[in-house]
Design a protein with these regions (language model features):
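Bimodal "functional hotspot" detector
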Residues: 1-291
């Protein structure tokens, strides 16, 4: 009787310890998953080996004011803005951001690169289409050193990491190209050209060219891949490729680098937020960009 009672007591004690262990660890597991699900990222621009590169950083607040402040602080911390730069204030109305800095803003190391990064980063937010820069209440109409005139409104057409492949100052067009640098950061390129071909043809021609590889940039896109057809809708585009794209299709999805270089280039050029990839009219993958 004593022996049975001892075994029962040991069994109950063991069971209670096991339950305590499970209860202690279970909420921790849930919290980890919830944190991963709620993880938010925002795009900022940093100077990496001479190229303004796209970097994703975590953020906590969905408030647009907080996002703007986060972008400016990151530019200060990474040398694209002078350390003593501060925001006097800003106002956002119908997609136009008016942002007022103190005079330390003018002490930029590379003024054109700073403006490129600032315009790109801020207009990457879905709430902002264009910006106006002020210094202590006065609109910045020209760059302080080069005296380059600035448009009244600065938007994506200002360009970033600009490359000019032009033979004439007439009929200039621009597409956005995205490549990876050797640190595996996406690098946006504003490519200006005179070619009469449609923008999609230009994008895929340049993504597959060796020109940018010589500058330590690559799209990972196989030269044999051909764009067969496309359909452009209001907020998405469907791209139909030759079956050579299957060489970059692994474990049920496109190789990430290929998907992102194509997807970002298309979304930024055509102002859509979704790219669908298809072969023989069958959808094989998609990329949705949100900010």
């Amino acid at each position: 009787m004593i022996k049975k009672y001892s075994f029962r007591k040991i069994a109950i004690t063991t069971l209670l310890l096991l339950l305590s262990f499970l209860l202690y660890n279970y909420p921790k597991e849930i919290n980890t998953n919830i944190n991963d699900m709620n993880k938010k990222e925002i795009n900022v621009i940093r100077d990496v080996n001479g190229y303004l590169s796209l970097i994703k950083i975590d953020y906590k607040s969905d408030n647009i004011d907080d996002k703007i402040s986060l972008i400016i602080e990151d530019m200060k911390n990474n040398g694209l803005l002078p350390k003593d730069t501060s925001i006097n204030g800003f106002a956002l109305d119908n997609g136009l951001l008016k942002i007022d800095f103190n005079k330390d803003f003018l002490n930029m190391k590379d003024e054109d690169k700073t403006i490129e990064a600032l315009v790109y980063s801020l207009t990457d937010l879905k709430e902002i289409n264009k910006i106006m820069i002020y210094i202590d209440g006065n609109r910045l109409s020209e760059l302080p050193i080069s005296k380059k005139k600035l448009d009244l409104y600065l938007d994506r057409s200002y360009g970033i990491n600009k490359i000019y492949d032009i033979k004439s100052i007439n009929d200039i067009s621009m597409v956005m190209l995205y490549f990876y640098n050797k640190d595996n950061n996406l690098v946006p390129i504003s490519y200006f050209y005179n070619d009469n071909n449609d923008k999609l043809s230009i994008i895929f021609k340049e993504l597959k060219s060796n020109t940018f590889i010589a500058n330590d940039l690559t799209s990972y896109l196989n030269n044999e891949v051909e764009l067969m057809n496309y359909e452009l809708y209001e907020d998405r585009i469907v791209l139909e490729f030759s079956d050579k794209l299957l060489n970059m299709y692994i474990d049920g999805s496109l190789v990430e680098e290929v998907k992102y270089t194509i997807g970002y280039s298309i979304c930024d050029t055509f102002n859509v937020n979704k790219v669908e990839f298809a072969i023989n009219t069958k959808k094989i993958d998609e990329l949705i960009l949100a900010n």
